[in-house]
């Protein structure tokens, strides 16, 4: 029996309806959430991502400002823009669109963002608080993936969860979130020996490695929940890290690419921005 689709479009639209109400409640108190996006250079994919974020802000009534900076922007100029946004009380969220041009130090730039305005959840303080199970801003993609599992009513506690990928942006925070939900978590990566022996026992399998259709049906056990975080372009078409058609015949639930976790990532960016605005408004 084919797997049930975890539809990111539907779930993101549902979340946006909830966020609209929260934004309206803030505006009734005279407070409008604000997001500043810093885009350096003219990378086409980054331009698309930023455009999608601007559209999401417009739908929800969030004030959006994009600082478009040339590719030869200096580190000093980038850092000055971040400090200016930090100091602006009308800005609740700051996002530096990655990747940055190679001559720029992205880690240093991200470390300058105030943790409470770090709506991407990449700041070392937010990452550290997540590892301790403390209140923090959570990275949007793993937060979105977890939201999809919970929204679908999929049990997590006590389940075997395997995360393939150990990036700071997805793999590590995903593993920590699943651990907080009382799953038994294994992280696999490029040096894992006999990967299929690990993925084959997963009740929940998260693929976040950036290799098109890498997870094949023989690596997945019957009835597994498969979350595909990958976004790859092959022959002009988008695909994930999972070989979707054959795997969907074995899994109980699966996220599609496109239309899966990617849709939730932007929705969670909006959620983080609204939450930051709510905290700022409460402190006035």
Predicted feature locations:
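Positively charged, low-complexity intrinsically disordered leader regions
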Residues: 1-31
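Short beta-strand segments
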Residues: 39, 95-99, 164
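Glycine-rich phosphate/diphosphate-binding loop of Rossmann-like nucleotide-binding domains
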Residues: 40-54, 136-225, 237-248
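Short beta-strand elements in bilobed, periplasmic/extracellular small-molecule ligand-binding domains
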Residues: 57-71, 185-187
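Anion-binding alpha/beta catalytic cores of soluble intermediary-metabolism enzymes, centered on
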Residues: 93-156
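Short glycine-/small-residue-rich Rossmann-like dinucleotide-binding loops
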Residues: 99, 209-211, 230-231
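Rossmann-fold NAD(P)-binding glycine/threonine-rich loop
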Residues: 106-123, 127, 230-282
């Amino acid at each position: 029996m084919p797997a049930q689709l975890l539809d990111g479009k539907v779930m993101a639209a549902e979340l946006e309806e909830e966020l609209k109400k929260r934004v309206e409640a803030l505006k009734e108190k005279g407070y409008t959430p604000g997001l500043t996006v810093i885009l350096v250079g003219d990378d086409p994919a980054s331009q698309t991502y930023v455009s999608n974020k601007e559209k999401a802000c417009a739908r929800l009534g969030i004030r959006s400002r994009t600082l478009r900076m040339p590719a030869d922007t200096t580190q000093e100029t980038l850092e000055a823009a971040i400090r200016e946004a930090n100091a602006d009380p009308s800005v609740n969220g700051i996002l530096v669109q990655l990747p940055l041009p190679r001559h720029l130090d992205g880690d240093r730039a991200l470390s300058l963002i105030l943790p409470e305005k770090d709506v991407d959840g990449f700041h070392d303080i937010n990452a550290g608080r997540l590892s301790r199970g403390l209140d923090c801003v959570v990275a949007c993609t793993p937060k979105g993936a977890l939201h999809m599992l919970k929204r679908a009513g999929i049990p997590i506690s006590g389940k075997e969860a395997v995360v393939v990928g150990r990036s700071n942006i997805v793999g590590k925070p995903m593993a920590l979130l699943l651990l907080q939900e009382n799953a038994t978590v294994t992280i696999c990566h490029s040096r894992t020996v006999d990967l299929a022996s690990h993925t084959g026992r997963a009740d929940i399998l998260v693929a976040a490695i950036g290799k098109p259709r890498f997870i094949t049906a023989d690596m997945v056990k019957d009835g597994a929940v498969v979350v595909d975080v990958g976004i790859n372009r092959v022959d002009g078409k988008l695909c994930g890290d999972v070989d979707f058609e054959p795997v969907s015949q074995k899994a109980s639930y699966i996220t599609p690419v496109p239309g899966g976790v990617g849709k939730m990532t932007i929705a969670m960016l909006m959620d983080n921005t609204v939450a930051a605005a709510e905290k700022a408004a409460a402190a006035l």
